A protein has these predicted regions:
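Conserved beta-strand signature within the Rossmann-like core of class I S-adenosyl-L-methionine
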Residues: 33-40
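SAM/dcSAM-binding transferase cores
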Residues: 78-133
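Short "lid" loop at the C-terminus of a central beta-strand within the Rossmann-like core
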Residues: 9-10, 41-45, 74-75
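A short glycine-rich, Lys/Arg-flanked "PGG" loop and its adjoining helix->strand segment in the class I
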Residues: 18-32, 60
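Glycine/threonine-rich flexible loop motifs
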Residues: 10-18
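Short SAM/SAH-binding signature in class I
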Residues: 1-6
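Conserved Class I S-adenosyl-L-methionine
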Residues: 23-24, 49-70, 84
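Conserved class I S-adenosyl-L-methionine
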Residues: 14, 40-56
Length: 133
């Protein structure tokens, strides 16, 4: 199973989707092989990076596997945005089966196995923010 949280910013109506209680509820309803993906703001601006660090800290205190990955979206502030990946058992790099993916023969304009691995390699300043929270 999969929970995708493509929420608004953690201010106002979207605030409830960034709470420890919400993440704990996600953990409770996911199977052992389930995955939670949440939008985690941008590391570039102080206000956004503060929320990114808070969300990651809450999630990593609940889920045994908690990672952050990045993508670039020119229409978002700074263009550099992050997502969280959380699971009880599945690691987004160690447990992915690229042979199975390649056997599907799906042609994409953006996604490929190298990008999948690379998006989890964070810039030093982002990794330091997450490590120091």
């Amino acid at each position: 199973d999969l929970i995708l949280v493509d929420s608004t910013d953690p201010i106002g109506p979207g605030e409830g989707l960034f709470t420890t209680e919400f993440y704990q509820n996600c953990f409770n309803i996911l199977s052992d092989n389930g995955i939670l993906v949440n939008q985690s703001e941008s590391p570039y601006y102080d206000q956004f990076s503060h929320e990114m660090k808070r969300a990651h800290k809450k999630i990593k205190n609940i889920f045994p596997i908690s990672k952050v990955y990045q993508f670039h979206m020119p229409t978002y502030p700074s263009g550099h945005w992050l997502f969280g990946f959380a699971s009880k058992k599945l690691d987004p790099i160690k447990d992915v089966d690229f042979d199975k993916w390649n056997a599907l023969g799906i042609k994409t304009k953006y996604y490929n196995p190298q990008l999948h691995v690379g998006c989890f390699a964070l810039p030093s300043y982002v990794q330091e923010m997450l490590d120091n929270e």
